Amino acid sequence: RGTPAGCTSRAVVRAVARGGVIRFDCGPRPVRILMTATAKVVNARGRRVVLDGGGRVTLSGAGKRRILYMNTCDPAQRFTTPTCQNQDHPRLTVQNLTLADGNATGQRQEGGGGGAIFVRGGRFKVVNSRFVRNRRTSAGRPSGC
């Protein structure tokens, strides 16, 4: 059985970059993980990324940063097809998780976007999750979460 001490921002960032199914094992009580960096999906690492908080995990941007980022057109996250706009992967699923206090204000890439999650391309699905006190940028389209 895991403990809250093992559930860190660094562990989340590494797990998201690796891809696959990520099930948090932080013990029996609710836990808040303060993200010290944005977790970025690496497009070429796998077709599926699932974050499952089991209903007990909150990822917090601490009012300082975006929590999750997936962009099929960002060369730093590696292209997997000649036309990044039409890519059907990766498939990011956020389930049984709370994303709180994410902040994208001041972000300029791709017109800003959501405070909790930025998604361009691929597929994105939310299941039984909450978004609380996230701040999107005022630039660009009025979208994002």
Residue ranges and their predicted role:
Residues 1-23:
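Acidic Gly/Asp/Thr-rich repetitive segments characteristic of extracellular carbohydrate-active
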Residues 13, 18, 34-50, 58-95, ...:
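Extracellular beta-strand-rich solenoid/capping regions of secreted or surface-exposed proteins
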Residues 26-34:
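N-terminal carbohydrate-binding/catalytic regions of secreted carbohydrate-active enzymes
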Residues 109-110, 139-142:
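Outer-membrane beta-barrel translocator domains and adjoining extracellular loop/strand segments
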